[in-house]
Amino acid sequence: MMDEEILDFQSVFRLPDESNDDLGTLVSGSTSQLARTVLLQTVLVRATSTAAMLGAAGAHQVCLQAWWVTLFGLDSVAVSAQALVAASLGKNDVPGARIAADRALSWGVGAGVLVGVVVFLSADQLPYIFTNDAEIAAQAATPIRILALLQPLNSAVFVGDGVFQGSADFDFLAKAMAISAGGGILALTAAGQMEGASLTSVWLGMATLMFGRAATLGWRYFKDDESPLYVTPFECAVYYDDLPSVDVDFVDVDAKVSKDETTKPR
């Protein structure tokens, strides 16, 4: 029989103190993240239903699998960005957080370019990893090339998500996803009603979603002075000036050579 002192059921089901400010922050952030996830999944469901109406459900699933594989690979940079930004902001070091985010974005976009090139060059063979049906593989080839071209943009978006999650900017992420998802759903709806539409049209609709996410996150990152990572160029310059410097004694090589020549024994 378990000791009641070890497991206190009353404490498990006790309501939290309403005066706790951290609880409100937790609930608000969690709600925003839930809304963001629901909006994104709504777009993905809409894309799948549109592909099914066009008779390309199998090829669409192949493309989605390629999407998820690249996403999880590139998302590793986003996880690093999230941790670095959170650590810097925890020390009230906004310029340091911004510099870490800039570096993560650079690495993310570079990795996206590399992955995009590999996916684009293997677009005809890649579907056969997921299917042995030649017709489905042929249907998936062109959308996979679109996916390949999107990789640098996708990576920037994933890192941007990580950066703003690290800065606890959850409310903005939900609003940005609402705008982007709205554009994506409109594009997918138009694709489903377009005469002669194909799976390529569906993935152009997915591209609309990603362009919307990139635009909203980019505005927040580069333009919005209310962003938690907003810094002026002067603040960045001061940050670099405050970095520990290394004193280096520079030697005039030409003067030293001349002196050595004049003092050399004849």
Q: Where are the predicted features?
A:
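Residues that mark transmembrane-helix kinks and helix-interface sites
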Residues: 41, 45, 79-80, 140, ...
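Small-residue-rich hydrophobic transmembrane alpha-helices
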Residues: 57-123, 155-168, 172-173
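Helix-terminus/linker motif at the lipid-water interface of multi-pass membrane proteins
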Residues: 14, 34, 38-69, 87-88, ...
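Alpha-helical transmembrane segments of multi-pass membrane proteins
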Residues: 24, 63-70, 134-160, 182, ...
